Design a protein with these regions (language model features):
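A short, well-ordered alpha-helix in the C-terminal region of glycosyltransferases
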Residues: 246-249, 253, 260-274, 284-287
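Membrane-proximal helix-turn-helix segments that form the acceptor-binding/catalytic region
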Residues: 2-5, 9-17, 39-61
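A short helix/loop element that forms part of the nucleotide-sugar donor recognition site in Leloir-type
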Residues: 93-107
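Conserved donor-binding/catalytic core segment of Leloir-type glycosyltransferases
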Residues: 108-124, 130-134, 145
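Nucleotide-sugar-dependent
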Residues: 124, 173-184, 189-210, 216-228
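Carbohydrate-associated surface elements
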Residues: 65, 83-86
């Protein structure tokens, strides 16, 4: 937000328009999760936010939840344009599970792999996924894999042992060049949110999972941006967040119906190609730039 002040000065000095690209909405997100509690600082950031929206010629947002939030703050609808974040669909793409290095290296061959890979923070309740795994521990073919930062994994390992989740494997982040094969090792990709996550939150992993061609199970609020994105794509199932039984039921459904998992993955891949490919996003930004300078 502070960068909006020099941007406005440069805009006035050179007579050029400002395009504000919103990847998050502050201070709303920080206040909602308790990272920002000082009332004076909240007022400062709120004032900067209003200034940024007022001085911008156009505001590009990454999802419809952002649009709804801005409209409640009386930002003119004609200022707002939705341009989603892109994914490299030539890099992240469906690959065969057979002879997959990630499966071989981690003894996952013959397993139904439920994969969560990414940030493990305040808004991602991975304990729910571990609890769901406990419900499935008697089905040896189902393996839950969580990939993340070492520090967060240490905390989860204690919880895993405490719950007796022997079917949960915790692994560190993989090198970027191995990401496509890691995603391809999964039968199901997970998106996890707490029930009270701010509604406009749009995890960037959704585009990546869709592009990988694997079915998604999203444990997210039904009225949130993430749920709408997955439902529109046709690439996954949405279940009640922080509900281990509901999550276990969804995992079991795809385990017992591999054809459904395949169909969801194919639909997700098609949606990613049509809506999240780099070329699509680039075209939208080119049109936006042409519009503001014409």
């Amino acid at each position: 937000l502070p960068v909006c002040v020099p941007a406005a000065l440069l805009s006035k000095l050179y007579g050029v328009p400002i395009i504000l690209n919103l990847q998050d909405i502050l201070p709303d997100a920080a206040v909602h999760v308790g990272l920002l509690t000082n009332q004076k600082m909240i007022k400062v950031f709120s004032s900067l936010e209003k200034f940024a929206y007022k001085t911008a010629s156009k505001i590009s947002v990454i999802a419809d939840g952002f649009t709804k939030n801005l409209l409640t703050k009386n930002v003119p609808s004609q200022k707002i344009i939705e341009i989603p974040n892109w994914v490299d669909v030539s890099f992240i793409k469906p690959l065969p599970k057979n002879h997959n290095y990630f499966r071989q290296e981690n003894h996952l061959e013959g397993k139904f792999v439920v994969l969560y890979s990414g940030n493990i923070a305040l808004t991602q309740p991975l304990e729910t996924l571990i609890d769901a795994a406990v419900h499935l521990v008697d089905i040896p073919e189902i393996q839950v894999v969580i990939v993340g930062k070492k520090e967060a994994l240490e905390r989860l390992e204690k919880y895993r042992q405490q719950q007796g989740a022997s079917n949960v494997l915790l692994l560190p982040f993989q090198p970027r060049e191995k990401l496509p094969e890691m995603l391809a090792a999964a039968d199901v990709g997970m998106v996890m949110q707490k029930h009270n996550v701010i509604s406009f939150n749009m995890p960037s992993k959704i585009q990546v999972l869709l592009a990988s061609g694997r079915a998604i199970i999203a444990s997210v609020p039904a009225d949130g941006t993430a749920a709408r994105a997955i439902e529109r794509s046709g690439g996954g199932l949405v279940v009640t967040p922080e509900d281990p039984e509901a999550l276990a039921t969804a995992i079991l459904k795809l385990y017992k119906n591999p054809d459904l998992a395949t169909i969801l993955g194919e639909k997700g891949r098609q949606y990613a190609e049509e809506n999240y490919a780099f070329e699509k996003t680039l075209d939208q930004y080119e049109k936006l730039f042409s519009q503001v300078v014409s």
